[in-house]
Amino acid sequence: MIRNFVISLRSTALLWILTALIYPAIVLVIGQLVFPYQANGSLITDSQGQVVGSALIGQTFTEEGYFWSRPSAINYSEGADASPTGISGASNLAPSNPDLLSRIEAEAQRLEDNAVQPTADLLYSSGSGLDPHISPAAAQAQFDRVAKARSIPPQELQSLITKHTEGRFLGIFGEPGVNVLTLNLALDNR
């Protein structure tokens, strides 16, 4: 009986060392050597080298000279009241909930007031509430507003949108999307 206890204790210790120490260390080293950008959060820096965000997490843009992101039920976990570990999630409001309808109507009105034709992803938040992309159609809907605010030639703005449009994953999965943060940084750096 003692022998079985010692064997099980050794097995537990060995598995713990393998799964809690050795395996994570190997994954960490491989990640840092093979995929350092992704392993460190896909961080994006500005022209001064300051980190301004992640390519994987959206941000709120409200100024006229910027492309606007999707609405976020959690406000992209920004601000003083944001959880330090970050949060994600949708509003979980039912389609019949009047609060959801009010939010969508207010967003549609804001877009129309700014001469932007509402598209689905400019009206509805994503499931995670952190989506960094808008559709190419949503970028085109904001084209005139941004071009006017920045006094940028249309062909130059169209070129920037095209450059920052990411295709389907492996050519077949998902939909093309425009990363709003990288597009807005490109506008600032032009």
UniProtKB/Swiss-Prot annotation:
Q: Does the keyword Magnesium apply?
A: no
Q: What name goes with this protein?
A: Potassium-transporting ATPase KdpC subunit
- Entry's InterPro entries? KdpC
Give the GO cellular component terms, alphabetically: plasma membrane
Identify its membrane topology class.
Single-pass membrane protein
Coiled-coil residue windows = none
PANTHER family recorded: POTASSIUM-TRANSPORTING ATPASE C CHAIN, POTASSIUM-TRANSPORTING ATPASE KDPC SUBUNIT
Q: Where are the transmembrane segments?
A: 15-35
Query: What's a BP term from Gene Ontology annotated to this protein?
Result: potassium ion transmembrane transport
Query: Could you give the subunit structure recorded for this chain?
Result: The system is composed of three essential subunits: KdpA, KdpB and KdpC.
Q: Which Pfam families match?
A: KdpC (PF02669)
Question: What is the organism of origin for this protein?
Answer: Synechocystis sp. (strain ATCC 27184 / PCC 6803 / Kazusa)
User: Which superkingdom, per the lineage?
Assistant: Bacteria
Q: What is its main location?
A: membrane
Q: Where in the cell is it found?
A: Cell inner membrane
Q: What does this protein do?
A: Part of the high-affinity ATP-driven potassium transport (or Kdp) system, which catalyzes the hydrolysis of ATP coupled with the electrogenic transport of potassium into the cytoplasm. This subunit acts as a catalytic chaperone that increases the ATP-binding affinity of the ATP-hydrolyzing subunit KdpB by the formation of a transient KdpB/KdpC/ATP ternary complex.
Q: Which family does it belong to?
A: Belongs to the KdpC family.
GO MF terms here are: ATP binding; P-type potassium transmembrane transporter activity
Q: Which UniProt keywords apply?
A: ATP-binding, Cell inner membrane, Cell membrane, Ion transport, Membrane, Nucleotide-binding, Potassium, Potassium transport, Transmembrane, Transmembrane helix, Transport
